[in-house]
Amino acid sequence: MGTVKITSRYGILLGFIALLCTIISAGIFFLTKDKIDAVIAAQQRELLLQVIPQDYFNNNLLESAVIPQDKNFVGIQKIYFAKKDGNVSAYAYETTAPDGYSGDIRLLVGLDPKGEVLGVRVIEHHETPGLGDKIERRISNWILGFTNQSINEHNLSEWAVKKDGGKFDQFSGATITPRAVVNQTKRSALIMLNNQALLQQLSTQVK
């Protein structure tokens, strides 16, 4: 009987401790959530500014995101609309190169409506350190080679790595990775440029 009481007492105590830990954890979460959200938002803003210069827009880019549902936008996961005084001046969009050496390479691309690439940044990848990871801005300047490059029907052959007859450098011992980034930037830019009417419709959803 005494053993049963002791066991019951310990059970109640452990339950109380578990409840207390849950309450404390929840309290910490709610106290820090706003700060965490603010840090994430600041990081997102900084990344967007790397592909669309500030003088291109005066709207809130973070609040301008649209997830395209139309089949014409296959390969483009999210579009941010940069607007200047209510008019669309550029797009930043997330796209994925499916053919990296070690899998998907997620990209953020800035593009104006005339086909000028304003910037490209890698959001996520699993490429080989010391080889394919040179696509990261913090490791090399290679990704800056896209900035201010135009794409149109007359120069499509230039949008390839030099090994394939294009103008973009490849990496020594790692051609697959830069090829994947160049090709997906090209493919996705053409999707955007060939669907201006649909983009105009989507832009009405944001301020």
UniProtKB/Swiss-Prot annotation:
GO terms for molecular function: electron transfer activity; FMN binding; oxidoreductase activity, acting on NAD(P)H. The chain crosses the membrane at residues 11-31. The keyword NAD does not apply. The complex is composed of six subunits: RnfA, RnfB, RnfC, RnfD, RnfE and RnfG. Its cofactor is FMN. It is found in: Cell inner membrane. GO terms for biological process: electron transport chain. PANTHER family: ION-TRANSLOCATING OXIDOREDUCTASE COMPLEX SUBUNIT G. It holds the Pfam family FMN_bind. Its EC number is 7.-.-.-. Keywords: Cell inner membrane, Cell membrane, Electron transport, Flavoprotein, FMN, Membrane, Phosphoprotein, Translocase, Transmembrane, Transmembrane helix, Transport. This is Ion-translocating oxidoreductase complex subunit G. It comes from Haemophilus influenzae (strain ATCC 51907 / DSM 11121 / KW20 / Rd). One of its GO terms (cellular component) is oxidoreductase complex. InterPro entries: FMN-bd, Ion_transpt_RnfG/RsxG.
